[in-house]
Amino acid sequence: MSLLQFSGLFVVWLLCTLFIATLTWFEFRRVRFNFNVFFSLLFLLTFFFGFPLTSVLVFRFDVGVAPPEILLQALLSAGCFYAVYYVTYKTRLRKRVADAPRRPLFTMNRVETNLTWVILMGIALVSVGIFFMHNGFLLFRLNSYSQIFSSEVSGVALKRFFYFFIPAMLVVYFLRQDSKAWLFFLVSTVAFGLLTYMIVGGTRANIIIAFAIFLFIGIIRGWISLWMLAAAGVLGIVGMFWLALKRYGMNVSGDEAFYTFLYLTRDTFSPWENLALLLQNYDNIDFQGLAPIVRDFYVFIPSWLWPGRPSMVLNSANYFTWEVLNNHSGLAISPTLIGSLVVMGGALFIPLGAIVVGLIIKWFDWLYELGNRETNRYKAAILHSFCFGAIFNMIVLAREGLDSFVSRVVFFIVVFGACLMIAKLLYWLFESAGLIHKRTKSSLRTQVEG
């Protein structure tokens, strides 16, 4: 890449970054937080944060990258995607009418809410316990990170339930919403994330998500400033780099350490070059249609229920890894959101996917606003826990693609909804057995006087 070509790419990158950052800043000033703000920051991180890192790798370490015209296509496709997404998100689908009293779809009380978070936490802890009994601490047993996907590791399906510890702790926080509950959320979820990091063998997702939710709650409540958020972001990047070194068993120093930091940080937070690789091989892609979305559900079907279930699932990430990169190491390489759309339907699917994503984020913000307006604090805690708990799925959306997002968000909704139903059933059983007694002011006064 020549300096002239880099200059042209830099101008396009700067314009796209300023365009998205400006719209995000205006939205932040208006509402302080919603899921449009979160997705916009996530989109910036995924598709634009990596460009400066790539530039340093090219000019400082002479690393090979896709041709400049392909990198230009990647930047422009990301910018156009966001423009279509933003218009869709801001388009009002129906006229605003005065809020008329409507019968709520469901309601919650204190006992049901506490039962819900206990069940969610129980699912996570039991899953971790069973996985640990089968495999021990994989971080200290395996020689390479790719081995966690091999037949040596049993009970891999249990990892999908680990994440429900975070929604459980979110319910606990939203029931109190003070600084002590906020700090308890951070300590409990990060400790759990470090535990799963050691047990699973290097998975950092729970740590990243817990830290991100902690920061956004702090921004919403005014407990941290934007400068503190930026400092925490830098600290998070350094922390993820250190965990990546431990995961891959790397011991580096000097120029090698700087080089490793650049490419690991780029691959962790901003795999935008993967989109460029897909565009570079555009003519060789056999468009998959909506099949990757259907196939991604296969991993949630137990083999005893479907004996003939394919052992290898050809979703967009695996198609990109196996068919485009010809990589059969056992690791699935992230195609990014736009890359998954390219795999499914080429350039035509990019604006269509942007419209779909705009509607998805609009739906999450609608739920979030319902929680903000809810007068029943127990129901509000459940709604907010669901919305913030889905942040993991939004990260999957930006990094892994639409197909991975759909299967995971459906799984999240089913498990979360099942926990709600079980909590309500248990409450009904306890109440029928006479074990539930409503609190009254007189009984509370008697307890205090006694």
Swiss-Prot record:
InterPro entries hit by this protein: WzyE (IPR010691)
GO biological process terms, semicolon-separated: enterobacterial common antigen biosynthetic process
Superkingdom of origin: Bacteria
Protein keywords: Cell inner membrane, Cell membrane, Membrane, Transmembrane, Transmembrane helix
UniProt keyword Amino-acid biosynthesis present: no
Pfam families named in the record: WzyE
Gene Ontology cellular-component annotations: plasma membrane
Protein's membrane topology: Multi-pass membrane protein
Transmembrane segments: 6-26, 37-57, 63-83, 118-138, 155-175, 181-201, 207-227, 228-248, 341-361, 378-398, 410-430
Pathway membership, UniProt: Bacterial outer membrane biogenesis; enterobacterial common antigen biosynthesis
Tagged with keyword Cell membrane: yes
Subcellular location field: Cell inner membrane
HAMAP family, per the entry: WzyE (MF_01003)
Subunit structure: Probably part of a complex composed of WzxE, WzyE and WzzE.
Stated role: Probably involved in the polymerization of enterobacterial common antigen (ECA) trisaccharide repeat units.
Family statement drawn from the similarity comment of this UniProt entry: Belongs to the WzyE family.
Protein name as annotated: Probable ECA polymerase
Source organism (scientific name): Escherichia coli O1:K1 / APEC
Higher taxonomy: Bacteria, Pseudomonadati, Pseudomonadota, Gammaproteobacteria, Enterobacterales
